[in-house]
């Protein structure tokens, strides 16, 4: 039956392209929406993920960066440094503000970095300096291109002028970017020299970040210590909570449209072969054989459509960033598993719907030319 289904499916190339193409486009819609949401989540936590820190220490009960404020006395850095298992501690200052160039205003995480820090700085420099000195700023390359900023130009950050000395990659999302200035400049503009926002902690070799975070939480008062993974997860959860309704509705609508198109494609493709099934019955095929043939054809169509739709989605993940868009698509394993499994179920159901008509076919209609 599988061989028969395969031959029947590939017998008419035009019909094959229509059925597989319809399924592929439907699945492309579903996979693309999932990839966009996964990509946005990845972009939002990129700074945390690439900070190089094993543990993030913040003010008590502050568990994320987005729309949050953390303030710690600088003495906390010395206390954390003496916790067993801590190899190094790097303080940073943080605020959400605009990078202003002419009439262009770009929302950004403004990060104040200590001199020669090994943690928390830009991880991918396309041109210029890798760390800002006093009076300097490193901004995202895409933001710079959109605003017409070149190396050596000045931008306004936190109400002061900074010379752009470096462009970073991977530090922009659909909603904001990350800009880096020196901690000294940050302190002077804020008018405070004895507080920090976050501590980025590197653990000693052989130490567990979870165990060291627990020690910091126990031994240092009024702080929250989280591993990098936990801190990133909290950041993603905040974004999800803020956009849950919109994203859920978009995903649901796209998913339902995609499944409806796929179900209709499989259904009409199955009915279009009624004459062929009638001929099989005339030649002595049992209804069970027809059922298996129909099901096999539907599943083959969906598998081919899924592979084609996945290829198109992966192509989009490469092409879209090339055109300078801050939109990043990322296909996740969970998305592939969800879409693939549901697609097979829908394919089976869609193929079963016309089976009653196929089972009731009169073999004589083949010879009557109907």
Residue positions per predicted region:
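Peri-transmembrane interface segments
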Residues: 36, 215-260, 269-274, 279-280, ...
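Mechanotransmission and gating elements of multispan inner-membrane complexes involved in transport
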Residues: 83, 156, 160-163, 167-249, ...
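C-terminal membrane-exit region of the final transmembrane helix in multipass inner-membrane proteins
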Residues: 331, 335-370
